[in-house]
Curated annotation (Swiss-Prot):
Subunit structure: Heterohexamer of two PFD-alpha type and four PFD-beta type subunits.
Protein's name in the database: Probable prefoldin subunit 6
Taxonomy, superkingdom: Eukaryota
GO annotation, cellular component aspect: cytoplasm; prefoldin complex
Function: Binds specifically to cytosolic chaperonin (c-CPN) and transfers target proteins to it. Binds to nascent polypeptide chain and promotes folding in an environment in which there are many competing pathways for nonnative proteins.
SUPFAM superfamilies from the UniProt entry: Prefoldin (SSF46579)
Listed GO MF terms: protein-folding chaperone binding; unfolded protein binding
Annotated keywords: Chaperone
Amino acid sequence: MSSTKAPVPPTQAEIQQIQDQLIKARDAFQVHETELQKLSASRSKLLTQLNENEMVKKEFDLLESEAKIYKLNGPVLFKQTKEEAENTITSRLDIINNNLKTIETNFKDIEKKAMEQRNKIFEYQNKIRSLTAPPPPQAQ
């Protein structure tokens, strides 16, 4: 005669502890999702700026070296040499590209953290399901 022990049902405290962990993981996931949305919006803005500045650079390439270029600063137009204007655009493009690289790196890091939290959420949900599921019928 073999003695099979029935599984010990989980206590309400154990289930509550897992639910608390689930809530913490969900909250962390939501924070990461919000950060990803902000980074995505920043990336879109930078891509627009990059496109605009690249178009300006192409326009400068078409100009003669002695062309008159004016820079708008508030309500006043200031005369600029082509070289100064090209240097300004080049430095803007460098800054934008560096910012894009930073955003891409941050996006990947946060996306990885969000996936880890999502996996934890699934893990906790499965634990809760397995603990609260009715026991299988006993074979006789």
